[in-house]
């Protein structure tokens, strides 16, 4: 392992888990494990400076020596097609739900699988560390509500674009059939339908632009004492007087203005790259039509 700033990077220099940098053709560079580990440390420290020092989130709690020291532990392994994960380690308080934990991060060892090619290697590493580091901050300071993982992923996907806006890895979640734009009738709080919660990272872009840069952090401060849906409602009302219900209705409007109908001044700044929301054609055979259907909570 190597100690770099606030982080201890654990990695192998031989074998299946050996990390590697990629060359211009996106192939692994032999004997580049140390360079990869140095990149992990530099990027992780940069992410911490942005998320903690610039955005004002709490830092990462001390893990009391787990992993070989007080530094936060990042493990580099061959994860196949998985970018990374953050694992709760030891409880900090004794709350039955919503408690805080120390944690560690595991990341892929080369990001060679990432698509498009422009995001392979270091770009994939960058957004992964921005994403997973915020999970560490969430778990360590604000609390882990086990039935509300959706908002943890929404926030961490949003954080990728905040810290590294040029990468746009989150675009991959917007177009597939499981996304918010293709299945808006799935509840906002759903975390069991494919990867739809990842496509809802755009909620963070909406909240930050509509209610201010500190609005998402205020939601997390409320999560210390309430589950995410209630916490979001409380935070938005304190900031703007708007309820979650009101904000959600406006968000649905934002999601109408994407693709060829985007307006980067009024809505998403990168909305021209987003798909348009799914539409359903209805044939009228008379002057009146009655449509009966149901919607899940917080869906459109």
Regions found by a protein language model. Give the residues of each.
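Juxtacatalytic substrate-recognition/specificity segment
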Residues: 5-148, 155, 166-167
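Beta/coil-rich, acidic/histidine-enriched accessory regions frequently appended to metallopeptidases
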Residues: 225-300
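Aromatic side chains
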Residues: 7-11, 57, 75, 134, ...
